Amino acid sequence: YEIASCLVGSEMCIRDRPQAVWTWLLLLYFIPIVGFILYLIIGQDYHKNKMFKAKEIEGELKYAVRRQEETIYHRQLKMTSPALNRFRDLVLYNLEAGQAVLTDNNDIRIYTDGKEKFHALIEEMKRAKKYIHVQYYIIRNDEVWQDIEKVLIEKAHEGVEVRVLFDSMGCRTMHKRDWDRLKCEGIRVAEFFPAILGQLQMRVNYRNHRKIVVIDGKVGFVGGFNVGREYIGKDEKFGYWRDTHLCIEGAAVTSLAVRFVLDWNYAAHENLFLEDHLFEIPQYDRHGFDPVQIISSGPDSQTKTIHDNYLHLIHSARNHVYIQTPYFIPDASILDALKIASRSGVDVRIMIPCKPDHPFVYWATYSYIGEMVAAGAKCYVYNLSLIHISEPTRQEA
């Protein structure tokens, strides 16, 4: 028991998950032999140190990160929006923690309707000349995917490089023959973290929920819509599906391209950084004036960048914090920050859906909502449909 306890205790310094550590310690105390065997099987992050061992960002992009860090330190980086100046410290944190380059020459289109989003996506894919990179957590073999698949096959026949990256668990309703059909048409396909023993996974949190499409390095789509008929409101269970997706034109698309390739390299055991044409840093004309940082987090991340951004925004809010989310299950730090904000006079409002897509998670959400109501927050239920968007807003003054 003492040896096992030391092994688990040492994980506290590595994982920064004290709740999990105490759970294992109690299990080891009451059933030491069984507990130790279970810990060896499911308690360790065997994959974490191996995941995404891709090369660091190279060349011009890596230099851009370093250059921006220096200019921010010396207060030389010009923020095109006066409001953005208030987030200078957060911009710097994202640069250092996530190598998230700030770009300010982007044009962003916002889609909150699935039909409009998929129509825009297909039209942009039809204009592709060099490559199309597609990454989704969920893809269902229905009319929505078939419309996309048709365009991908046509572009592959024209000589456009097409890659499709899917998550094994999220796309479990797809069959091997569906992916083989794409391969026969000249499309590269890779599966993220294939399931073992059917659908059994020792760590279900090692999933890739990203929804990214990059076209020629010039146009990028990112957001909450997966691929399926429910996302265009054709599922009777959910009705109209409320989500948000972005179409970005401008220099920020390069960051999306890099994110896709990091995931692709891990899943396909390749190194696309060697293919220079995928990572040309275009000298963009000014498409717009929207500043963008692409921030990502996951089991491979050394820092919880997205989590820390939320925490910073909540702590610095002076007027209000508004949150829309399908799953309100915050960790202790976020929950405490929201309670403190609410009790300090900040107007905290949380909106959740009226229809669950994951019942257990839904009722867990209500448990935390109860705590927030007790702390003085206002909580709302979106009655029209399932709201899948995860979107916080805050105001300083």
Mark where each language-model region is:
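Short, surface-exposed helix-loop/turn micro-motifs enriched in polar/charged residues
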Residues: A4, R17-Q19, V348
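Single conserved hydrophobic/aromatic residue that forms the stacking wall/gate
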Residues: Y1-G9, I14, I387-A397
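Charged, low-complexity intrinsically disordered terminal segments
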Residues: I57, Y73-A397
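Membrane-embedded alpha-helical segments of integral membrane proteins
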Residues: S5, S10, V21, L27-F30
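Transmembrane alpha-helices and immediately adjacent membrane-cytoplasm interface residues
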Residues: W24-K55, G59-T71
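Alpha-helical architecture
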Residues: G9, F30-I33, H157, R343
